[in-house]
Amino acid sequence: MLKYLTSFILILATNTESQPAAAQIKNTQIRMPCGSGIANYEHPSQYSFTTVNAKSSLVRQINFGAEGLKSGQLSLTFVGHSTFLIQSPENIRVITDYNDYFRADVQPDIVTMDVEGGSHSTNLISPNISYVLRGWTEALTLQRHDVTLKDVRVYNLPTNITDFGAGFSNFSSIFIIQSQGLCIAHMGHLRHILDQQQLTDIGRIDVLLIPIDRLVTQSHDELIHNIKAINPRPIIPMHFDGMPTAKTFLRDISGVYAVKRFGTHTMMLSRSTLPIKTEVLLLPPQRPGSRLRPRL
């Protein structure tokens, strides 16, 4: 009997491993967090981050192909609302909060959806997408992911957990994209102060994508508290579909961090060109507007 039971478990494990990528991963073994074992980096002495212009290596308009990317570089495009396209030198494309309203005109390899909602998720999934990572489960259980595809790793931290893990309130996830020595965190619909264990589980974060609308997310005071605890270099706002929302946030944070505005929605990232100190980089969305019709 024990022999048959062991065989059944092995078969079940094999079948689970070979499930389509769109199937939700419920018992993923989480590895070391982003940045573990990497010494604190130093910027080259000749590096100076004082101005942003069209010729800056940080703000280069690039094609969606990976031809312009070198080892150690990532491209990041603010598609709209909470959707970003992140692309690696091996042409792996990650799209955050994949939905039917704000979509890049490329086929992604990995998509994340931090919360269930019209502009944050979709059930219309191409079979060509390698991994579909949702930040929630219908059964209200913890959803953990940790996947690697070529030179890109994506993992998550469930958030908004109440009742000591027994229930959820607007259950969501922070998704971390790790590639080329960079760690990028998409904060999703985080609604609380992160504790020390959560900060440890997230790991070192170089680039932080933050919601600024205060509607179903953190207040600006809570947001600034979490930014200080995470200590990223660039902070890139999301969850704004018009300048009034952005202006309110910039007013609240300008006394804490320097603010730089960009004229392009795509930027090049590398560890050597990160700002020395934490600062806000405001990118215009590629597809602005909160009332777009679904792109099916």
Model-derived features with residue positions:
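Short, structured coil segments at secondary-structure junctions
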Residues: Q107, I230-N231
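Active-site-proximal loop/helix segments of hydrolase catalytic cores
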Residues: F102, N160-I230, D241, T245-K247, ...
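Bacterial N-terminal signal peptides
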Residues: Y4-N15
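Generic marker of residues within folded, mature protein domains
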Residues: A13, L76, G165-G167
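Residue-level signal for inorganic ion chemistry
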Residues: I235
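A Lys-centered signature of the CheY-like receiver
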Residues: M238
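Metallo-beta-lactamase
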Residues: Q19-T159, I184-H186, D206-I210, M243, ...
